[in-house]
């Protein structure tokens, strides 16, 4: 599992582009919020997270993306 961690003020392109490419490659990828069900990036774009950090089991993480 690949987790893309989203904190308020994240760089949108650094989150969306890798997520898209990883999913196209067939890797299970989840957007993970550090601050609630939605997170706003540095340019005011809001994304809905697949999971909140409290729901994540990092022991099965193959990769972490930190935008």
Regions found by a protein language model. Name each.
Residues 1-67:
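Extended, subdomain-level signal for the structured scaffold at the beginning of enzyme domains
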């Amino acid at each position: 599992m690949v987790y893309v961690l989203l904190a308020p003020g994240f760089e949108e392109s650094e989150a969306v582009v890798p997520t898209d490419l990883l999913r196209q490659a067939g890797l299970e990828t989840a957007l993970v919020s550090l601050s609630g069900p939605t997170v706003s990036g540095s340019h005011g774009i809001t994304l809905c997270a697949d999971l909140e950090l409290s729901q994540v089991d990092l022991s099965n993480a193959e990769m972490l993306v930190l935008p």
